[in-house]
Each structure stands twice: as C-alpha cells, then as structure tokens.
C-alpha cells in the first residue's frame, strides 16, 4: 500500500504500535546473526514468547509517546568487512553495524509505518529497496531502451555512478528537513530523528572494542530504516537538481541511467 502525499491529513498523530505489530517484528528477525552491545540474539527474543513481547510493547509505546529513545539503542558495534584490494587500506572495508535487538524490533515497526508514505513520495525512477522491483526488471528495461534506441538511431548515454560511502555521507539535518518538506507525518519524522540522535559506535577487531565514537552523519548499515532514509535523501538530490526524470531508470546506490539530454552532474 502507498499513501499519496497530496491526500490525507499529514498532521494527524500516528497511533502507537499494537502488540501484534511487535510480535510480527519479532517473527521477522533473522536467526544466526551476531548480537549488539546487549548480547541478545533473535533466537533468545523469540524464545521469550508473548511475555517478552508484552514488556517490549510497553517500552515501545512509551518511546512512541515521549519520542525519546533509550541511550543503549543509539549505540552499535561496527565490524569492518573486507571488500577488495589491500587489507591495510581502510577504504577497502565496509562496516556492518551490530544493533541492539530491541532497537531492531522498533526500527522494523517504524519502517513498516514509514514505507507507505515513502512509496507515495519517491518517483518511479527509483528502484532500490522497493518491493516488486527486481534487478531482472531493470536489466530488461535497459535492454529495451538500448534495442529501441539502436533501432531508431537515437543517441543514448549510460552513466554509472558508484557512491563512495553512500550511507555514511548523508547529512542528517538536511535529510530531516527534506522529510518535513515531503510531508512525512510529524510523529514518524520525530521518531526517525530520535533514532539518529547522539548515535555512537565502537569498532570491533577480533575480540577488541574501540572507545565509543560519536557519529553525526549518515545512516547505519544493518538498520531497517537506512534504506528508506537513503531513498528519501536521493529523492531530495534529484528534485534539487531539477532533473527531468522522464524515461529515466535509477537502480541501487551504484547505478543510474539517463538519456543524453537528462545527464546533469
């Protein structure tokens, strides 16, 4: 389901999550994942059953009302994963954030509440992290563009962009300003802001943890909200650039395709 940003009362309060939403978020947790600073795993939470869900629901409702997230939820462990090249060069690694299990549940609930609004805001040219828009669909679409342009001798240009540290480079203040201009409900925006306020991380190398590092920009890898917030940030860039998106395909944070007259860097 999507919600048209031009319809409805976007100042209306979003009601707190139900116990059913909490239970569904618990069920969606993936097993065999490393724990965060709370040392709690998905298997342990699921074993807690209805009693755990009831207590967590009470906490989430309190957070929903006060818009204040417990400090522990804003802390994470970052594990560097080697991607390629020289192992001594930091840029050849990507970081995966290990988050507290209770925050993962809260984040998943907030993701489900935000998704219909985001789907009604971002354009059809964005395909990353969107249900029903597979890689195969985009490959098929670009092949059709190539074949038709070749058939009718239309000049076509392809632009491949690799965003370096895409998640880490997002300016949070600008992101939330964009969310406000795009009429994201105030409650959901406030909770998303709370989830990104005063975030800290500790780098884990083998069994050693660094001192806490305050992070002021970016969204966290491994956070359910990260993909939605990244798509909103990219939507703001597209709108601010004044790009005519007709006939354009955007797919993943690495690739974009434009016709010649639509290229703007």
Region locations from a protein language model:
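Conserved short loop/turn motifs at secondary-structure junctions
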Residues: 40-48, 126-133, 160-166, 263
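Surface-exposed loop/turn segments and immediately adjacent short secondary-structure elements
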Residues: 1-91, 97, 101, 105
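Short helix-interrupting loop/turn segments at helix-coil junctions
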Residues: 1, 32-35, 54, 66-72, ...
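Conserved catalytic palm subdomain of right-hand nucleotidyl-transferase polymerases, strongest
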Residues: 32-40, 78, 88-98, 137-180, ...
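Eukaryotic intrinsically disordered and solvent-exposed regulatory patches
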Residues: 64-66, 143-147, 246, 251-253
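Conserved polymerase palm-domain catalytic core
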Residues: 163-261
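Amphipathic alpha-helical oligomerization segments
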Residues: 133-139, 228
């Amino acid at each position: 389901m999507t919600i048209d940003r031009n319809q409805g009362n976007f100042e209306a309060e979003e009601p707190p999550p139900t116990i059913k939403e909490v239970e569904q978020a618990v069920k969606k947790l993936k097993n065999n994942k490393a724990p965060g600073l709370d040392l709690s795993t998905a298997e342990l939470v699921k074993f807690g059953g209805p009693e755990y869900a009831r207590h967590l629901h009470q906490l989430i409702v309190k957070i929903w009302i006060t818009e204040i997230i417990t400090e522990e939820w804003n802390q994470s462990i970052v594990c560097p994963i080697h991607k390629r090249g020289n192992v001594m060069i930091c840029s050849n690694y990507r970081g995966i954030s290990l988050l507290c299990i209770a925050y993962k549940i809260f984040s998943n609930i907030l993701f489900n509440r935000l998704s219909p609004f985001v789907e009604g805001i971002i354009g059809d040219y964005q395909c990353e992290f969107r249900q029903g828009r597979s890689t195969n669909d985009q490959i098929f679409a670009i092949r059709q563009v190539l074949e038709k342009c070749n058939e009718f001798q239309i000049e076509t240009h392809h632009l491949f962009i690799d965003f370096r540290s895409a998640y880490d480079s997002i300016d949070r203040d600008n992101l939330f300003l964009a969310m406000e201009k795009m009429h994201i409900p105030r409650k959901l925006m406030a909770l998303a802001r709370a989830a990104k306020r005063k975030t800290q991380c500790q780098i884990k190398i083998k069994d050693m943890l660094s001192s806490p590092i305050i992070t002021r920009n970016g969204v966290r890898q491994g956070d359910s909200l990260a993909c939605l917030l990244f798509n909103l940030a990219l939507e703001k860039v597209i709108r601010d650039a004044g790009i005519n998106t007709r006939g354009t395909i955007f797919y993943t944070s690495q690739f974009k395709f434009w016709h010649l007259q639509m290229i703007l860097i």
